[in-house]
Amino acid sequence: KMSILEVNNVSKSFGGVKANVDISMSVEKGKIVGLIGPNGSGKTTLFNSIVGTYPIDNGSIKFNGKEVSELPVPVIAKLGLLRTFQQTRIYGKLNCVDNMLISHKGSDESLFKIFSKIPKELTEKAENLLNFVGLYQKRKLRAGDLSFGQQKLLELAMALMNEPEMLLLDEPTAGINPTLINGIID
């Protein structure tokens, strides 16, 4: 089976602190893989390197066979490789559906333009994904009024809005109550 992600001998330091040293791993298409380690062991740094947030010091990162280690975040995202964050990145003053619409990859445009011509299918897709993560009943609520766990579910739905080929989840269950966690895992 072909690997969707290949990380080869990747290292990243901040000043004198070595966050990642010669990390190598590959992930097959369609697999769910867990990266486990204590706090401060470099998991988030590796995620940031894979999606282009941190340039690597050496090594190689290939996504679908294409070297991506020199590419900027938006280009890597357009290739279908996305991540969520330990801290949620939502628009607190906007409702859940609007958050979903903004996250759609066509949203490099101004907000006014985004909201002035939303295809019905896009709104339906947003509502279906909100239903998938259990937030359909709260779709008209301001995102800032959701619990932390619900905000993480919203962020997951926002990432899925772009149908990524690969989604890196950074601490997806931190701060979420166990009932919601079981919903995510299902």
Residue ranges and their predicted role:
Residues 167-171:
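Catalytic Walker B motif of ABC-type/P-loop ATPase nucleotide-binding domains
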Residues 36-38:
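The feature captures the beta-strand-to-loop junction immediately N-terminal to the Walker
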Residues 59-66, 79:
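Conserved ABC transporter NBD signature motif
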Residues 113-138, 183-186:
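Conserved ABC ATPase "signature" region
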Residues 163:
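Conserved catalytic motifs of ABC-family nucleotide-binding domains
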Residues 51:
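Helix-to-loop junction immediately C-terminal to a conserved catalytic motif
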